[in-house]
Amino acid sequence: MTLLSKRSLYLAAATAVLAVGALVFFKSGTEIAPESKFVLLDGSSKTTAELKGRVTLVNFWATSCVTCVAEMPKIIATYNKYHPQGFDTIAVAMSYDPPAYVVNYAQTRQLPFNVAIDNTGAVARAWGEVKLTPTTYVVNKRGEIVKRFVGEPDFAELHKLIESLLKQV
């Protein structure tokens, strides 16, 4: 092999590596929401597949989490503001949260959205081994996770994102 052909080969290989790297770097970054079955307080259930067609906030929380309790009025306000436009919320209580506490909290605060109890921890595992609360996912109409917040979201940013997603087909 001549020096020129070796250089050409190395240049072609480097170009291929850069192209693959660029493809990975510029990929949309969205992932499909995991298949999950949410067991709601009334005993009914909802699946991830049923979320399609609506922008949905999936909020992992606990009654013992100070930040979760503090952000809940903002989650309620967000739900009330955007629900008529095709927005939904599922609040998933962590497996360590006593069901009686979750039911009491949901009833006394009159939570207007679906509240699920993750008794086995299967939902938290499916959504990326959620351990910290609050952890909140925003799912678009196609069932793709477009944003994950750990801790209380910046609600102004969240509202802009929801408004943008609601406009999408």
Regions found by a protein language model. Give the residues of each.
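Thiol/disulfide oxidoreductase modules built on the thioredoxin-like
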Residues: 104-112, 119-164
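Alpha/beta-hydrolase fold active-site loops
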Residues: 55-56, 87, 134
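Short extracytoplasmic/periplasmic juxtamembrane "stem" segments immediately C-terminal to an N-terminal membrane anchor
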Residues: 36-54
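Structural microenvironment flanking redox-active thiols in thiol-disulfide oxidoreductases
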Residues: 69-109, 119-125
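Short active-site neighborhood of thiol/selenol oxidoreductases, capturing the structured segment around
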Residues: 48-66
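Solvent-exposed coil/turn segments that connect beta secondary-structure elements
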Residues: 41-43, 63, 94-97, 118-121, ...
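N-terminal targeting signals for export/organelle localization
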Residues: 1-39, 169
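Hydrophobic beta-strand core positions in alpha/beta domains
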Residues: 57-59, 91-93, 137-138
